[in-house]
């Protein structure tokens, strides 16, 4: 369920995926921390199937194997049902580059090329946020730290300041939709809660 798409300077397609809501696993409710919202790179290598909807990415679960691990969605009909082993085989499923927190609902992605912000050529994601967790999360614009093509971690640039992007007392009154870079390296993001466009600046 890829939503935000971006073609980089090497003509490779990056995407951010919105995972499903109300997720259970063999009857156990795991929706608060799962599925992780995926960052995918379509570069012509490996499997052409990226897992949705037969498989999902772990973000945080009891007895889990780590963020980004693929699991089979046990709620599917028997004809569509896969196994965990099948989902983890890269010959079947192209693994994600990174798994962001569940229910962030990322909608926009861009690779920063400018110099106005001290973020190198990292990826920047605009996330709309979601209702489907006990503590609503994800109204953020986040930086995805990279090492080559690998994403190693995320950092909230603007929005809810909790490490999980959770809404806090006096919650931020915006819901990011997309993020774009202007020719001069300025970064802007749109907000459909207030019908606004914000400019991101760096204060030293």
Where are these regions (language model features)?
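Conserved interaction-surface patches within small, structured recognition/assembly domains
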Residues: 176-178
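Blade-level signature of beta-propeller repeat domains, shared across WD40, Kelch, NHL, RCC1
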Residues: 180-204
């Amino acid at each position: 369920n890829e939503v935000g798409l971006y073609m980089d300077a090497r003509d490779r397609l990056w995407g951010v995926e919105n995972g499903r809501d109300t997720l259970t696993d063999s009857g156990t409710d795991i929706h608060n921390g799962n599925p992780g919202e995926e960052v995918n790179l379509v570069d012509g290598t490996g499997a052409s199937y990226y897992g949705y909807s037969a498989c999902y990415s772990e973000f945080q679960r009891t007895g889990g194997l780590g963020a980004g691990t693929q699991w089979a969605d046990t709620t599917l009909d028997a004809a569509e049902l896969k196994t965990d082993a099948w989902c983890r085989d890269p010959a079947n499923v192209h693994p994600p580059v990174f798994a962001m927190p569940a229910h962030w609902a990322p909608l926009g992605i861009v690779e920063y090329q400018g110099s106005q912000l001290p973020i190198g050529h990292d990826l920047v994601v605009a996330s709309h946020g979601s209702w489907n967790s006990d503590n609503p999360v994800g109204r953020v614009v986040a930086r995805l730290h990279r090492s080559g093509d690998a994403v190693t971690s995320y950092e909230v640039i603007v929005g809810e300041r909790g490490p999980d992007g959770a809404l806090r007392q006096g919650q931020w009154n915006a819901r990011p939709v997309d993020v774009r870079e202007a020719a001069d390296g300025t970064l802007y993001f749109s907000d459909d809660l207030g019908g606004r466009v914000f400019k991101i600046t760096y204060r030293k």
